[in-house]
């Protein structure tokens, strides 16, 4: 105590151990490690990170964008490519496409050759996700999101639904997904979740928690996640993937940043900045 929060981080290597081989002092890196499970987090000026869990920072973006990226990149990547087994030509529904995970998921799905439908709350967010490549946008406050998806898919439902909201949205996802389709959620299901539709449709329901390898001490899985970041570095530097920052806060105003997230009005990511 006190606990140091923050899973994501980016910065310049200040010092290395005698066995470090991948990085040198002065290298710019980004990573997702710490903040949970007894590991000190990154709401700080310095962090200690195993070299195997870090990746070179994309050279085309600043440290603010890089610090906001790792958790959402890995989460969206694992959810779509590993859990959802997304392939070219598939139709995918991404809930809350303007959010931190959602806005990355739209781009990764398009890179895989999928057709993307997403849900948002406002016209402003609808414009944002269209710029990211969304093919069909549902304003869920203005229309029935289940019927809207069924209308878009001629009554069949999508091949893969990615739930980034939880609660009743997970239950809605079952009705929006085609028979033998996939539903991936990043949140624990509500105790009142009705699983009958999922069973009747023979859906494969998967969970995605990218923090599991860190919490369980799974070394190889953490190394594999750093490899995902390396691939994302290439995509970002090739201008194929964008990390959108809606607002930055000084580290001393971390509480205000958390309150802003709770409003649900942000698009993309918020970032805490240390003094340079």
Model-derived regions: residue spans:
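C-terminal substrate-binding/catalytic core of Rossmann-like NAD(P)-dependent dehydrogenases/reductases
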Residues: 147, 197-247
């Amino acid at each position: 105590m006190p606990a140091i929060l923050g899973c994501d981080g980016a910065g310049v290597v200040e010092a290395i151990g005698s066995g470090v081989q991948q990085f040198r002092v002065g290298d710019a890196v980004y990573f997702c490690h710490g903040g949970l499970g007894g590991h000190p987090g990154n709401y700080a000026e310095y962090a200690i990170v195993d070299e195997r869990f870090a990746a070179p920072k994309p050279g085309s973006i600043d440290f603010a964008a890089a610090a906001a990226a790792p958790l959402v990149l890995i989460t969206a990547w694992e959810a779509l490519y590993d859990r959802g087994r997304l392939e070219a030509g598939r139709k995918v529904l991404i809930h809350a496409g303007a959010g931190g995970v959602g806005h990355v998921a739209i781009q990764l799905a398009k890179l895989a050759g999928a057709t993307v439908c997403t849900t948002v709350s406002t016209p402003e967010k609808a414009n944002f996700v269209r710029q990211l490549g969304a093919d069909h946008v549902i304003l869920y406050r203005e229309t029935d999101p289940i019927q809207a998806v069924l209308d878009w898919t001629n009554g069949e439902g999508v091949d893969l639904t990615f739930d980034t909201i939880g609660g009743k949205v997970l239950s809605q996802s079952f009705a929006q997904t085609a028979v033998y389709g996939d539903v991936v959620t990043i949140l624990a299901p509500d105790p009142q979740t009705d699983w009958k539709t999922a069973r009747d449709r023979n859906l494969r329901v998967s969970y995605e928690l990218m923090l599991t390898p860190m919490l369980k001490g799974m070394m190889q899985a953490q190394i594999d996640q750093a490899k995902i970041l390396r691939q994302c570095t290439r995509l970002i530097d090739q201008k194929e993937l964008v990390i959108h920052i809606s607002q930055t806060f000084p580290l001393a105003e971390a509480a205000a940043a958390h309150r802003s997230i709770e409003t649900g009005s942000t698009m993309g990511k918020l970032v805490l900045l240390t003094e340079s």
